[in-house]
Structures are given as C-alpha cells and as structure tokens.
Swiss-Prot record:
Organism placement in taxonomy: Eukaryota, Metazoa, Ecdysozoa, Arthropoda, Hexapoda
Gene Ontology annotations for the cellular component aspect, listed alphabetically: checkpoint clamp complex
Record Gene3D superfamilies: 3.70.10.10
Listed Pfam families: Rad1
Stated name of the protein: DNA repair protein Rad1
SUPFAM superfamilies reported for this sequence: DNA clamp
Keywords annotated in UniProt: Cytoplasm, DNA damage, DNA repair, Nucleus
Tissue distribution of the protein: Expressed in ovary.
Subunit description: Component of the 9-1-1 checkpoint clamp complex consisting of Rad9 isoform A, Rad1 and Hus1-like; the interaction with Hus1-like is direct. Does not interact directly with Rad9; this interaction is probably mediated by Hus1-like. This complex probably also forms with Rad9 isoform B, however 9-1-1 complex containing Rad9 isoform A localizes to the nuclear periphery.
GO BP terms in the entry: DNA damage checkpoint signaling; DNA repair
Length: 274
C-alpha cells in the first residue's frame, strides 16, 4: 500500500498566498465603508463585496494569477468584519510582508498569517470569525446594455480631477455624451454653488471613449467620495453608465510584482427631480 503524503494545509477548502501585501491592504482599506463584507472564493478568484444599503456597492476582485498560490475546493462564501480584516493585515505597519489565507469550512474562522520579509524568525497568525451572509445585489446585469457609455481614463489624472472638485459639494452630476461636453463632472454645493470639470474625448487622460448616447445623472457626494482611496491607487479607471444613470467605476490597481487587483464600484443615481 502506498502512503499518501498529507496536505500541509490539512482539510482547508481555500488556501492562498500573496507575496507582497501592500496593494492588497490598500485595496481592502479602499472598500471599508461598512462593517461587514462578503467573501466569495471560486476557481475564478477571490471576491470581497461591501454594500451600503441599496445605494453603493464595492467589490475587490483578485484572479488566481494575482496570487503566488491559490487553491480552492468548490465555491466558498462567508462574511467577515472588514475593520478586523484590515487591522489584522496591518499588524506590521508599513513593513513588507507575505500573506497566507486559509479557510476550512462553514463556521470556521478565516486564518491570516503574515510573514515580514525583513525578519525570517517572526510571523503572526490571526483567526477572523466568519458568519453567514446574504448574496450581494447583482448590478452587473443592468450594465449589459449594448448602448452602454464606456470611458477608460488614466487613474492618476482622474484622481487629480476629483481632488480639484468642491469638497463641500452635496451632489455630483456626471455627463457622458458622444457630443461636447464628452465627459463632464459638476458639483453642486452649499447654496447651490456649481463647479465643473470637462474632459474632451481627445484629452491625453482618455484611453478609450465609446459613448453612444447622452446620459446625465446625479449622485450623492458622499458615495462618490467613497471611491477616493481606490482612485488614488488606480492606474486606470473604466467609467460605465447605462441610460438611467447607474454608474460603474472599474479601477485597476497594480502590485509590486505587476499583478493586478480590481475594484468595482456600483453607484445608484438620485431620482430625477426635473
């Protein structure tokens, strides 16, 4: 009889390793706007989704290729406290660390092990309580319209535009159009003070421009501001809107090893009061 070598991870149904966690921590912190997040793991990769009511949703996505190691058995889904996850990942401060995540089965904790690169004799392990959670809202189905407006822009440029906008604004108005102004952001602040930024489709910050209809929609400033942390670290951003103004911001963050982490925001427009 041949002995079968036991797995070093026991009966874990999910095991993953990230060699450098700086970008992963930035991504986690950029979506910590609610207490709880839903973790989904499949052969497609890792997703962590956070929602606030039915007005904004953010999903962090890492494909298997973004990990040094990625193993999953069946589809795994569980909830975690986002602030606990963020704090555990930040235990070594700004020190460069590798990360191992392990999850055994429903009701078991998510184990996080950090290994600082500058000290081979040190590591720390956290066991994060998991819980049952509801399925996230599937906004993606609402953005399958062939007449969708799609714009790709350079992340640092868009972040600069947002930083120039009025900080006390109560609402943001987005205009995407095949005609001028091709892409316009207007803030409406206290006493209805208005400030606008226009970006032509020929602007150097534009990477792709494909708008088939004029869409004008307003959003709560607070929700747009929730994208700031991710925006500051993004290399490029896809902006998508459908005919009713459902807004998707799809951001790409690049890690130290050139791996890509994706952050996807869905923001519900305010009702048209015209």
């Amino acid at each position: 009889m041949t002995d079968v070598e036991p797995s070093p991870y026991g009966d874990c149904k999910f095991v993953a390793r990230v060699e450098h966690i700086k970008t992963f921590i930035q991504a986690i912190k950029s979506i910590c706007f609610n207490d709880y997040g839903m973790v989904q793991v499949s052969e497609d990769g890792l997703r962590i989704t956070v929602e606030q009511g039915k007005s904004i949703q953010a999903t962090l996505f890492m494909p298997p290729g973004a990990f040094m190691e990625f193993r999953v058995q069946d589809f795994q889904c569980f909830g975690v406290k986002m602030n606990v996850l963020s704090e555990c990942l930040s235990l070594f401060g700004s020190a460069d660390c590798s990360l191992r995540m392990m999850y055994r089965d429903k009701g078991d904790p998510l184990k996080i092990i950090l290994y600082p690169h500058d000290d081979d004799d040190v590591s720390t392990e956290c066991a994060i309580k998991t819980m049952d959670c509801d399925e996230p809202i599937d906004y993606d189905q609402n953005l399958k319209d062939p007449d969708l407006n799609v714009i790709f822009v350079r992340g640092p440029n868009l972040s600069k535009v947002f930083n120039e906008l009025e900080k006390s604004a109560e609402e943001f108005e987005f205009v995407t159009s095949p005609n001028r102004p091709h892409f316009k952001i207007t803030t409406v602040g206290i006493m209805q003070a208005v400030f606008s930024v226009e970006v032509a489709k020929t602007s150097p910050m534009m990477m792709m421009f494909n708008c088939k209809q004029t869409v004008v929609a307003r959003y709560k400033s607070q929700q747009i501001r929730m994208t700031n942390k991710a925006m500051q670290s993004a290399t490029k951003v896809a902006i998508k809107t459908n005919s009713v103004g459902l807004l998707e911001l799809h951001l790409v963050m690049q890690g130290d090893s050139q791996e890509e982490i994706f952050i996807q925001f869905f923001i519900i427009p305010l009702l048209n009061t015209d």
